[in-house]
């Protein structure tokens, strides 16, 4: 029996630059002075550089007040860029889009905001946490932000399954459409950056420490000389949509999903 055909509209954060880097072997891994200061064994990282000017293209001044969650920052940028690349409008109206939802995953998000909040609470400054502390630190914060910005009225969920989170979100979104419960789904995943996320991995000694002097050579997962992974962060997003719907509105179509499956992953 043939699978129904669904289509994907894809955009990865900085798609043009990312594609150029892959084609030309350009590494985004750099020396991380903060990891050196904190005496990490691995002192290189892949951290997106987001300028304040760029942030203002995706968040209002009010939203950026007391904002301190890189995972949500990366996810919102990737999600909104994917939405626009799919030819979908970003509108401010009172009517939710009941046919569209999001399943956007994260491993850990808002750790810096957690740290900030803990210090304020311990200093008896709970009232200074701000009204967005919860949204920035809850796992489903990224899907809540995207759902709110895009007015999504269908399922708004965050999944979390370590390294398979992004792939799992695609399959979950695909199944939602396949079951006839949604016309389109914004899917993807995001991850915070910083030492409080990466410290545990450094302690496990699974991060490379042999390339601190040559960061661009640190990420080499398929090499016989690989000595561990490089702590990194960022986000990726896709718009999944019914074939008929995508064709009817002349959407840019990148690929087709025929099916998929989720098992127990790498657990022993």
State where each predicted segment sits.
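Glycine-/small-residue-rich "gating" segment that lines the acyl/pantetheine channel
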Residues: 123-130, 171, 175, 179, ...
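Short glycine-aspartate micro-motif
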Residues: 99-103, 183-187, 254
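Active-site pocket-shaping loop/turn-to-helix segments
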Residues: 9, 59-80, 129-138, 156-171, ...
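Active-site-proximal alpha-helical scaffold in enzymes
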Residues: 75-88, 139-150, 156-190, 229-251
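Condensing-enzyme catalytic core mediating Claisen C-C bond formation in acyl metabolism
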Residues: 2-3, 20-23, 27-31, 214-268
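Low-complexity basic/metal-binding stretches
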Residues: 3-11
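Conserved beta-ketoacyl condensing-enzyme motif
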Residues: 17-19, 23-158, 190-200
């Amino acid at each position: 029996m043939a699978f129904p055909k669904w289509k994907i509209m894809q955009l990865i954060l900085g798609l043009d630059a990312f594609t150029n880097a892959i084609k030309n072997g350009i590494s985004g891994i750099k020396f991380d002075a903060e990891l050196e200061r904190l005496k990490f064994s691995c002192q290189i990282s892949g951290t997106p550089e987001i300028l304040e000017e760029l942030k203002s293209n995706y968040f209002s001044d009010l939203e950026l007040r007391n904002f301190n969650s890189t995972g949500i920052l990366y996810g919102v940028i990737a999600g909104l860029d994917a939405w626009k690349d799919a030819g979908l409008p970003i509108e401010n109206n009172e009517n939710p889009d009941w046919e569209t939802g999001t399943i956007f995953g994260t491993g850990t998000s808002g750790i810096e905001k957690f740290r900030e909040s803990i210090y304020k609470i311990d200093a008896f400054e709970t009232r200074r946490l701000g009204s967005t502390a919860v949204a920035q630190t809850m796992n489903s914060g990224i899907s809540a932000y995207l759902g709110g910005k895009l007015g999504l009225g269908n399922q708004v969920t965050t999944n979390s399954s370590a390294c398979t989170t992004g792939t799992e979100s695609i399959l979950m979104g695909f199944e939602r459409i396949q079951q006839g419960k949604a016309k389109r789904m914004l899917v993807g995943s995001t991850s915070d950056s910083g030492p409080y996320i990466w410290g545990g991995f450094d302690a496990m000694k699974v991060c490379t420490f042999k390339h601190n002097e040559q960061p661009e050579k640190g990420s080499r997962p398929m090499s016989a000389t690989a000595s561990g992974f490089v702590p990194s962060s960022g986000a990726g997003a896709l718009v999944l949509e019914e074939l008929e719907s995508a064709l009817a509105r002349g959407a840019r179509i990148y690929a087709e999903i025929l099916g998929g499956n989720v098992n127990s992953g790498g657990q022993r």
